[in-house]
Regions:
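Short amphipathic alpha-helical elements of helix-turn-helix/winged-helix folds
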Residues: 34-39
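Short, cationic-aromatic polyanion-contact patches
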Residues: 18-28, 43, 76-98
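Short, hydrophobic-biased segments on the C-terminal half of alpha helices
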Residues: 62-63
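Short alpha-helical segments that sit at the start of domains
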Residues: 4-30
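Amphipathic alpha-helical dimerization/coiled-coil segments
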Residues: 92-124
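A short acidic, leucine-rich amphipathic alpha-helix
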Residues: 46-50
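Glycine-centered, phosphate/nucleic-acid-interacting loop/turn motifs that mediate DNA/RNA or nucleotide
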Residues: 69
Length: 124
């Protein structure tokens, strides 16, 4: 079970993650989106600690979210030496992310139906 900030993932958020996965989204991406939709912003480390995902899993999810322009990223200087921490926030409304998957699935299904219709024609 996933925990957000030490708390168990709420039943509705768990259902969101499972529903997103059933649309073809990876578990890591679904979990990260569910987490970011519940906070204003978070560092990669905060996401890791709150969701139980490993650093590479969060990085892959963030890359996909950046490619889709669903998040914004800014650097926050840390005290002392070292690289600044990247802070992520979800900038695309959750409904728009769902719309993206709705359109993707619709296109896939239309392509399948064209193949089925072609096969019906060939079978005559």
């Amino acid at each position: 079970m996933i925990s957000f900030g030490g708390k168990q993932l709420s039943e509705s958020n768990e259902e969101i993650v499972e529903s997103l996965k059933s649309l073809g989204m990876t578990r890591n991406l679904a979990t990260t989106i569910a987490y970011l939709s519940n906070v204003k912003e978070a560092s990669s480390q905060e996401i890791e600690m709150s969701t139980g995902l490993r650093q590479p899993e969060v990085s892959v999810a963030m890359r996909e979210m950046r490619e889709n322009s669903w998040i914004s990223v800014h650097n926050e200087k840390v005290t002392g030496k070292g690289r600044p921490t990247k802070i992520y926030s979800l900038t695309t409304p959750f409904a728009k992310i769902i719309k993206h998957y709705e359109e993707k699935i619709r296109e896939e299904n239309e392509a399948r139906m064209r193949i089925i219709n072609k096969l019906k024609t060939l079978a005559k």
